[in-house]
Swiss-Prot record:
Protein name: Phosphatidylserine decarboxylase proenzyme
PTM statement from Swiss-Prot or TrEMBL: Is synthesized initially as an inactive proenzyme. Formation of the active enzyme involves a self-maturation process in which the active site pyruvoyl group is generated from an internal serine residue via an autocatalytic post-translational modification. Two non-identical subunits are generated from the proenzyme in this reaction, and the pyruvate is formed at the N-terminus of the alpha chain, which is derived from the carboxyl end of the proenzyme.
Origin superkingdom: Bacteria
Species this chain originates from: Legionella pneumophila subsp. pneumophila (strain Philadelphia 1 / ATCC 33152 / DSM 7513)
Site (Cleavage (non-hydrolytic)): 248-249
């Protein structure tokens, strides 16, 4: 725990938003020499498997961000026939039941649904006895996010906030981390009731985006997007791409009807998992 505190302490002191803006600038630079240097060093440092990428040649990407949100060959991530599939490549930080509206962040640390979604009590009440899974995407992982289940898009809320790292050490130290960081809460209707996918920002995450909106502009103000009427093609099928991170981060998946979700027993905190793998059955 002491090591975690030492690792995390500098994050309270550094200008996280300024560093993130600078990182975002360089990630979009198209100068061949600079972008190739950044991409090739990243591949070496994190041992990225480019054989899975739709475009295998690192030099073929226009900028670092294009490389980072690279598409994978479809055959590399076959979709299981499970009722609920994993929406990302990553690691399970925590998974289980929402207890009286509280989600487990790490041992001994909790945060509320209402804090996470920045919503009123009536909406949060729907998830009081729900189920959740927190999925951490490491730098080497595929950073596009897909649908875990067929769903109808309802609305989206951009919530400004801090930009702490979301690495495991930080989650063990910073209270209510996912409810403090910048995030995008996306609300859906499914055949078993409401579902929310929360895309959490972090240090040097240049942008969070969705397939229907593109990059969501960073702001100091909370912003809501209502798709109840103007969005025509609202049904997004299981496995379809719905968003991406330009660096970072974490996805928190919430289901309101907890009694209907039975998580795969092999899924434990710390488990690695890939897009398309079984996550839960609907009972």
């Amino acid at each position: 725990m002491f090591r975690d505190v030492l690792k995390t302490l500098p994050q309270y002191l550094i200008p996280k938003h300024g560093i993130t803006a600078l990182a975002g600038y360089f990630a979009d630079v198209k100068n061949p020499r600079l972008k190739n240097f950044l991409i090739q060093n990243f591949i070496r440092k994190f041992d990225v498997d480019m054989s899975e990428a739709l475009i295998e040649d690192p030099k073929s990407y226009d900028c670092f961000n294009d490389f980072f949100i690279r598409h994978l060959k479809p055959e590399c991530r076959p979709l299981s026939q499970s009722d609920v599939i994993c929406p990302v490549d990553g690691c399970i930080s925590e998974i289980g039941k929402i207890e009286r509206g509280q989600l487990l962040q790490a041992k001994g640390k909790y945060y509320s649904v209402q804090e996470l979604l920045a919503c009123d009590g009536q909406l949060a009440e729907q998830f009081v006895q729900g189920q959740f899974a927190t999925l951490y995407l490491s730098p080497k992982d595929y950073h596009r996010v897909h649908m875990p289940i067929d769903a109808e898009l309802v609305s989206m809320t951009y919530i400004p906030g801090a930009l702490f790292s979301v690495q495991p050490a930080t989650t063990r130290v910073v209270p209510k981390l996912f409810a403090r960081n910048e995030r995008l809460a996306i609300f859906f209707k499914t055949k078993i009731g409401p579902m929310v996918m929360v895309m959490v920002g972090a240090t040097i995450v240049g942008a969070i985006g969705t397939s229907w909106h593109g990059d969501v502009k960073r702001s100091k103000e909370l912003e809501r997007f209502d798709y109840s009427e103007q969005f025509l093609d609202k049904i997004i099928s299981q496995g379809s791409e719905m968003g991406y991170f330009k660096l970072g981060s974490t996805v928190v998946l919430l289901f309101a009807n907890g009694e209907k979700i039975q998580w795969d027993k092999e899924l434990l905190a710390g488990s690695k998992i890939q897009l398309g793998k079984p996550m839960a059955i609907i009972t």
